């Protein structure tokens, strides 16, 4: 499947496409997952938006339900899967050390970034370190304690810096 340095570099660039998708969802972004949940927020005058927007109120009051757009972590896990593909397949390709470090470092850093947001918003969560290559129950792993999620983040950041 991956046969050239170009394949690995293209897949690494694809990580950022996936990451942009994760944060381009209507209300699933750092503002909604972060600042809006911890303090007063108001839309500026002239935006045509109201603080009474139901999803915003759910976020602010911490009364989210599964139907709220801001509760969907699937785009973050799609990004993690792209990172896992790079981490699995790039080392099997002959390429320059600089490009290998670029690919693996980016994959580790972005995977850590995604897990940071998952841990911050949801706490306990599945920790997946291999690409999804099948179907069935294997693609629905159980949640790990949030401490294990943070340990994965730390490992990835150390490896990315290394």
Label each region the model flagged:
Residues 9, 15-23, 48-122, 138-148, ...:
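Conserved, well-structured interaction surfaces
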Residues 116, 129-131:
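Glycine-rich, histidine-containing beta strand-loop boundary motifs that form or position
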Residues 131-138:
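Short glycine/proline- and charge-enriched loop/turn segments
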Residues 1-49, 125, 129, 150, ...:
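An aromatic- and glycine-enriched ligand-binding surface/loop that stacks and positions planar moieties
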Residues 1-4, 96, 134, 145:
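General structural signal for secondary-structure boundaries
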């Amino acid at each position: 499947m991956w046969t050239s340095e170009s394949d690995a570099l293209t897949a690494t660039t694809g990580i950022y496409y996936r990451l942009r998708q994760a944060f381009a969802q209507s209300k699933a972004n750092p503002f909604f997952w972060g600042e809006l949940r911890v303090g007063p927020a108001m839309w500026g005058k002239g935006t045509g938006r109201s603080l009474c927007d139901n999803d915003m109120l759910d976020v602010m009051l911490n009364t989210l339900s599964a139907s709220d757009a801001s509760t969907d972590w699937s785009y973050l896990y799609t990004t993690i899967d792209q990172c896992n593909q790079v981490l699995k397949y790039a080392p099997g390709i002959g390429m320059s050390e600089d490009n290998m470090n670029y690919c693996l470092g980016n994959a580790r850093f972005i995977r850590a970034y995604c897990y940071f947001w998952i841990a911050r918003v949801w706490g306990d969560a599945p920790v997946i370190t291999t690409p999804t290559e099948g179907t069935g129950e294997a693609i629905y792993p159980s949640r790990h304690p949030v401490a294990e999620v943070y340990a994965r983040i730390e490992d990835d950041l150390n490896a990315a810096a290394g």
